[in-house]
Amino acid sequence: KGEIVGIAGVSGNGQSELIRCITGLEKVDGGKVTIDKKDITNKTVMNIREAGIAHIPEDRYMWGSAPEATLAENALMGFEVSKRGILNIQKVTSHAKELISKFLVKADSPSQKIKELSGGNAQKLIVAREMAMETPLIIACEPTRGIDIGAIEFIHDQLVAKRNSGDSVLLVSSELSEIMDLSDRIYVIYDGEIVGEFKRGSIDEKALGLLMVGGKNNEK
């Protein structure tokens, strides 16, 4: 707890499959997935979220949001907002406004479709929604891919704040600088296997990049 653990790897080496297994999007064939000693192996996505894992998916439009839906509708994904099957519109709108304001999402209104936002603002809404769950663990997969520098810095600050609050972040990224700057511990994945584990400052960017493409680490 209270740390950012980075998983560094080039796309296609198994990190996406690993996260899908942890978050319930793909079945686990062997081994176990646990959080706080609780077995969540092959549980449903909702069961896993309820167990304390929030998830920022690598594809913000395929997995992280419903592009045709409004900001308000996207902001409520994963939250209890209905009573006896009746949607509380006031609660939905209020929740969305709070997230938009707190995470500096540039939008016209909660009724705007998320697909109409810039990539950075759409991503900030997704991050806001997952952070609002206040889970002990958040998994962030390629959280800053394809967005502007301002949004990158803002999201990085949110992940660090999450760590500083005593919670944990599992950061999956192919961006070397992101992994190096944010992670307290780093695992390198290559061809579906963990090929290295390092503490902050114990490996440089060149050596890390070499491991990510199947090379050897010659650092002492």
Which role does the model predict for each range below?
Residues 1-220:
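Glycine-rich phosphate-binding loops of nucleotide-dependent enzymes
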